[in-house]
Structure formats: structure tokens, C-alpha cells
From Swiss-Prot:
Localization in the cell: Cell membrane
Keyword Ribosomal protein: no
Function field: Key component of the proton channel; it plays a direct role in the translocation of protons across the membrane.
Signal peptide: none
Family: Belongs to the ATPase A chain family.
Pfam families assigned: ATP-synt_A
Organism ancestry: Bacteria, Bacillati, Bacillota, Clostridia, Eubacteriales
Main location: membrane
Gene Ontology biological process: proton motive force-driven plasma membrane ATP synthesis
Annotated source species: Clostridium acetobutylicum (strain ATCC 824 / DSM 792 / JCM 1419 / IAM 19013 / LMG 5710 / NBRC 13948 / NRRL B-527 / VKM B-1787 / 2291 / W)
Protein known as: ATP synthase subunit a
Entry's Gene Ontology molecular function annotations: proton-transporting ATP synthase activity, rotational mechanism
Coiled-coil segments: none
Gene: atpB
SUPFAM superfamilies xrefs: F1F0 ATP synthase subunit A (SSF81336)
Alphabetized UniProt keyword annotations: ATP synthesis, Cell membrane, CF(0), Hydrogen ion transport, Ion transport, Membrane, Transmembrane, Transmembrane helix, Transport
Length: 221
């Protein structure tokens, strides 16, 4: 298993040369799959739900409940962004089920998600309490705590990035080691069940949960 993502092709824009890696291509494919799946599942919706519509309603209700429970009624407008993030990361985590290494073992991918979360956290705080209130929250505990409060703005996205990256990387490394031993005949199926299904779903839950908690705390400070 290689830790670095391979370059598939390059794109030149002016004097800049952009390397398009395997993980970037995989994300494009996953986005296309999600869009097509969403179109299929939401086509011809009816008042009396059929099996297909029931699946969609179950997913929507699950995300609604997650946001409501952890952020409250006034944050229900966050359902689309939280839901989109959760579904996208979940699909990326579960690619191991079809023999493709998860894109989330690439730190550039998890860093991208962490930056989106950081933007959401800070932009929401500024929108709700204003620029003045946001700056005041940094200085509210006295000058001695200003460096710590500023450091917190950096450590939150860093921790979100590393938590998801390390957990998915460890799973990929373990599976790679197993496949290089004679035990590969018996062990891959149950191990894939853990690392790709259980751990993959768990990491999605932890990531979006922390994003919601930090977003709410950013307003309450």
C-alpha cells in the first residue's frame, strides 16, 4: 500500500500545473454516484411512500434527528450541509468494500473536509453574534487567554483532519498487512466488515458530531 496518492494526469492553467491524483478522481466518481442516486431515489415521490421513498425518508429523518438533538431546533437549517458532508464522507469511507482504498486515508482529503467544518464553525459564529461579538469572544477571558483562544481556532480543524485521516489510514494499513499474509483466505471478510462498515460509519458520525458541537459552542461563547 502506498501512502501518497498517485497522479493520474495534470492540468495546466496559465503558469500553474495542477496534479490530479487518484483520490481527486475517486471523489469526482463518488460525487457523480451520489448525484445519480439522489435523482433516482427522489424521482416520482408519492404521498404514500414506497420502499424506495421510505429509504430516503429514513435517511432524512436520521439527519434531522442528529442535528436537532445536538444543535437544537434553531439550527435545523444546517441539515443540508451536515447531511451532504455525512453522506459524502461515508461513501468515501466505504469504497474499501469494492476493493478501492478509501480516499479519506489521504490527508489532503480530510484536510479539505476539516477546512469546510472550520469555515462553517467560524462563519456561523460571525453571522449569529456579529464581527464585534466574535472578536469579543476571543478577548472575553482576558489578555492572558487570547493566545489560547486563537490557538483553539487552529487546533479544531487540525484535530478534525487528523482524527479522520489517522483512523482511516490505520484501517487501510491493517488490511494491507492482512492481505500480505496466508491469513488473507479467512480474515478479510470480517475485517472489512469492521474497518469499512463499522469504523467507516463511526468516523463519519464522530466528524459531523464534533462539527455540530463546535459550531454551537462558537455561538454560545
Amino acid at each position: 500500500m502506498e501512502l501518497g496518492a498517485k497522479t493520474v494526469f495534470s492540468m495546466k492553467l496559465g503558469s500553474y500545473n495542477f496534479a490530479i491524483t487518484e483520490t481527486v478522481v475517486l471523489q469526482w466518481i463518488i460525487m457523480a454516484v451520489i448525484i445519480l442516486l439522489a435523482i433516482f431515489l427522489t424521482k416520482n415521490l408519492k404521498k404514500v411512500p414506497n420502499r424506495k421513498q421510505s429509504v430516503i425518508e429514513m435517511i432524512v429523518n436520521l439527519i434531522n434527528g442528529l442535528v436537532k438533538e445536538n444543535m437544537g431546533e434553531k439550527f435545523m437549517n444546517f441539515v443540508p450541509i451536515i447531511g451532504t458532508m455525512a453522506v459524502f464522507i461515508l461513501f468515501l469511507n466505504l469504497t474499501g468494500l469494492v476493493g478501492i482504498e478509501p480516499a479519506t486515508k489521504d490527508i489532503s482529503v480530510t484536510a479539505g473536509f476539516a477546512l469546510v467544518s472550520a469555515f462553517l464553525i467560524n462563519a456561523t459564529a460571525i453571522k449569529r453574534i456579529g464581527v464585534g461579538g466574535y472578536i469579543k469572544s476571543i478577548f472575553s477571558q482576558g489578555p492572558i487567554m487570547v493566545p489560547m483562544n486563537l490557538l483553539e481556532k487552529v487546533t479544531i480543524p487540525v484535530s478534525l483532519c487528523l482524527r479522520l485521516f489517522i483512523n482511516m489510514l490505520v484501517g487501510a494499513i491493517v488490511m494491507s498487512l492482512i492481505y500480505s499474509t496466508p491469513a488473507k483466505i479467512l480474515l478479510p471478510v470480517p475485517l472489512h466488515g469492521f474497518f469499512d462498515m463499522f469504523d467507516g460509519v463511526l468516523q463519519v458520525y464522530v466528524f459531523v458530531l464534533l462539527t455540530m458541537i463546535f459550531t454551537k459552542l462558537g455561538i454560545e461563547h
